[in-house]
Amino acid sequence: MNAITVLLKTEHIAAVCLLVFGLTRAGAQAAQAADHLPGYQAISMKDDLAHRSPDIHWPAGFEPEKADLFAHNDLIINASCERVWTHIIAAKRWPTWYPNSKDVEIQGGDPVLRDATVFRWTTFGLAIESKVHEYVLNQRLGWYGYAPGAEPTFYHSWYLEPEGTMCHVVMDEAGVGKDVASLRKSDETLMHRGHDLWLATLKWMAEQK
């Protein structure tokens, strides 16, 4: 039984999966249908800003309060932060468990992300390039996202904090620019929903024995 099969056994995660796939493959009609599934509650950017983590190190120009789009997600995972970290940095393997990612290629052929790593991948149906900006082993990972050859328009951050034998995983992302503002206008919660799916599948992977 694979990760996606297991995840679809819960209504909340099924809703998230349908929303992501509906938006990237079948359009807004599938997204609207998924919004009405039991257990799913839409989150606004205002809600995410109110709950954002004070522990994220934001680079200049990507402060959440100034962003055109922002998403905050967090989840407790019943595994050590060291174990969770190994799955986060193994970017080449993301497509095997996170369905909103594909075609991950790390510059230099390294299988994992490191400080200053540059990598290309496809997410939300968009081919992008990313560069690691912050790397603190087992605790912090942050990267810029941009169209190849263009200036950064997104900053994605992970923050891992031990809670006993478990790990509190925070994922915050901010975007700036006209295209980002247009995305917010058309679908403000798209990024939040995609990140819900990412954390849910990460939890499934990290908690496997």
Predicted feature residues:
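C-terminal segment of classical bacterial N-terminal signal peptides
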Residues: 21-29
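Hydrophobic/aromatic beta-strand elements that line small-molecule binding cavities or substrate pockets
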Residues: 73-75, 128-134, 145, 154-162
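Bacterial N-terminal signal peptides that target proteins for export
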Residues: 2-14
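A short, structured loop/turn motif at beta-sheet edges
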Residues: 78-82, 133-138, 159-168, 208-209
